[in-house]
């Protein structure tokens, strides 16, 4: 495949101390001559230089890093210009590069890295996840995937299928020369692989949830302090807070970081019997959010601690954290037992109990989303689809059928696993993966 030499700004557009402009392709070194750099640039060494435009006017003083293929991110010759982050300077350099090279499209540098076998598709997805990560745990998950945790797992499964397929094809072609014990073991091997695939898929979508955010709905009766707590955790005034019950009608969301985990807290309408049609819709949405959330904070006002609210108490289950709100006069930090449920007393206005609540959230999240070194999480719907397809094929294999049919099923399963890592890559799959990147990556 013949590809043009491409260029793009790799750092965010805007004023900054330093900007990085990348060039990749077989003609990348021609940029030196174009910018009037007469001295030789040593590969993999930071070199100070002046850049000149086509009129011989100086553009900027820069640091140049030159990577010779295949020892670069893309596997091609790569030149990086580390310039001052002036918009004027960036525009002038990009304009000069545009005279001899082609602007890169979104994700095109990473696409070339994939095409040149520098990364597989799971690592490519991890790159964009790392760029988009906002919390420590999101970044750690992406880095684990970039290090090849998923690739190694999927390649090992794929190799197992290839080994089985090889034995069957050998039997088809040379039945008298194949050890019958090798064929007798196929059912056992496929059963083991099926169990591994099922275990991998039955992960409660932890990787995807960690990537997108862990949802926690705040629910309770009207005026129980839900919006006040929501604003306090979000550290800004998002929800309207008033003394009038039923102020919150719709759900509101805010992203926060709890011990490195990405949490999406949801403020909801107060749950009660209401004749107001709009409030009824808000209550319906509140219950739906509570049902679909990963966890929920169920709030009960301190002054109503002895009043059994059947509708609120019915919301409490194993994924609930119970909070006794407006406990302004409580100085102890111990949990309080109410109707056989343990409540943590908090006072937002006095800033009491909030750290205990956050620690409870941390404990719940850590328990459910703890990394496992031997079983990395699936992190995208694309991966899940192909793993599920592989499982379906393996599960439905009938070893009583002619070996030619079994061999074809094995080829299909090998192909599905190949699509996960990109060994077999349809164009629409590549467009879907790399189209999510920004220009310059």
UniProtKB/Swiss-Prot annotation:
Q: What is this protein called?
A: tRNA modification GTPase MnmE
Question: Which key words tag this protein in UniProt?
Answer: Cytoplasm, GTP-binding, Hydrolase, Magnesium, Metal-binding, Nucleotide-binding, Potassium, tRNA processing
Q: Return one Gene Ontology term, BP aspect.
A: tRNA methylation
Q: What does this protein do?
A: Exhibits a very high intrinsic GTPase hydrolysis rate. Involved in the addition of a carboxymethylaminomethyl (cmnm) group at the wobble position (U34) of certain tRNAs, forming tRNA-cmnm(5)s(2)U34.
List the EC numbers from the record. Answer: 3.6.-.-
* Subunit structure and binding partners: Homodimer. Heterotetramer of two MnmE and two MnmG subunits.
Protein localization: Cytoplasm
Name the enzyme group at the top EC level: hydrolase
* Annotated residues for binding of Mg(2+): 227, 248
- Tell me which cofactor or cofactors this protein depends on: K(+)
Cited InterPro entries: G_TrmE, GTP-bd, GTP-bd_TrmE_N, GTPase_MnmE, MnmE_dom2, MnmE_helical, P-loop_NTPase, Small_GTP-bd
| A Pfam family reported for this protein in Swiss-Prot or TrEMBL | MMR_HSR1
Q: Name one GO cellular component term.
A: cytoplasm
| Comment on bound cofactor | Binds 1 potassium ion per subunit.
Q: Does the keyword Nucleotide-binding apply?
A: yes
Binding-site residues, (6S)-5-formyl-5,6,7,8-tetrahydrofolate = 22, 80, 118, 441
Q: Which organism is it from?
A: Ehrlichia canis (strain Jake)
Principal cellular location given in the protein's record: cytoplasm
User: Which lineage is the organism of this entry classified under, starting from the top rank?
Assistant: Bacteria, Pseudomonadati, Pseudomonadota, Alphaproteobacteria, Rickettsiales
Which HAMAP family does the annotation name?
Answer: GTPase_MnmE
GO molecular function list? GTP binding; GTPase activity; metal ion binding
Provide the TrmE-type G domain boundaries: 213-366
